[in-house]
UniProtKB/Swiss-Prot annotation:
Component of the Rcs signaling system, which controls transcription of numerous genes. Binds, with RcsB, to the RcsAB box to regulate expression of genes. Involved in regulation of K30 capsular polysaccharide synthesis. InterPro entries: RcsA, Sig_transdc_resp-reg_C-effctor, Tscrpt_reg_LuxR_C, WH-like_DNA-bd_sf. It comes from the Bacteria. This is Transcriptional regulatory protein RcsA. It comes from Escherichia coli. GO terms for biological process: regulation of DNA-templated transcription. Residues 155-174 bind DNA. Residues 131-196 form the HTH luxR-type domain.
Length: 207
């Protein structure tokens, strides 16, 4: 299983390499990459099954973010796992935001990686056909409300602007927290901004 790791943190690289080796991936199939340009070349030449990327490698540069977005779109049969660079927050979940793009906490447990990568570790096949989890999506109301929430508007302001009861606003907030698997506002905002950065944003159900 060809794998690429793009993370400037040596501890993370060591941890991921150790995990992959313990699951039967050969050392020669694990490649460390440092730049987005090198990642594009490696993805074209190696057609990796999985690419691990730390968002710190691209998030601070708009052109790098666009390039990452392009690479993800160009390789639909590669699973890209992007680690959130968010400190001092207890969050060890992961979210599928596109068929081949998963946003994850760096605190993800080995068992969770097993759940995600289990089938691809056993079979030489495209990972995206095995991912048995729903893609994160919001209703139109949830999406509009989340933008207002992120803009610093409170429940009463959102209630007035959307012409819905405050209780309904709270209910929508509860749904958003459930879907993003956290009650931490900082994590929610981070997930939204990162998704906006490397895709066209969280899917919105137009129904």
């Amino acid at each position: 299983m060809s794998t690429i790791i793009m993370d400037l943190c040596s501890y993370t690289r060591l941890g991921l390499t150790g995990y992959l080796l313990s699951r039967g991936v050969k050392k020669r199939e694990i490649n460390d990459i440092e730049t987005v340009d090198d990642l594009a070349i490696a993805c074209d030449s190696q057609r990796p099954s999985v690419v691990f990327i730390n968002e710190d490698c691209f998030i601070h540069d708009a052109s790098n973010s666009q390039h990452i977005k392009h690479i993800i779109n160009q390789h639909p049969n590669t699973l890209f796992i992007v680690f959130m660079a968010i400190a001092n927050v207890h969050f060890d979940e992961y979210l599928l935001v596109r068929k081949n793009l998963l946003i994850s906490s760096k605190s993800i447990k080995p068992e969770s990686l097993d759940d995600i990568l289990g089938d691809i570790l056993k079979k030489e096949t495209t990972i995206t056909s095995f991912l048995n989890m729903p893609t994160l999506s919001l209703s139109r109301t949830e999406s509009s409300m989340l933008r207002m929430w992120m803009a610093g508007q409170g429940t009463i302001q959102i209630s007035d602007q959307m012409n819905i009861k405050a209780k309904t606003v709270s209910s929508h907030k509860g749904n958003i927290k459930r879907k993003i698997k956290t009650h931490n506002k900082q994590v929610i905002y981070h997930v939204v901004r990162l998704t906006d950065n490397v895709t066209n944003g969280i899917f919105v159900n137009m129904r």
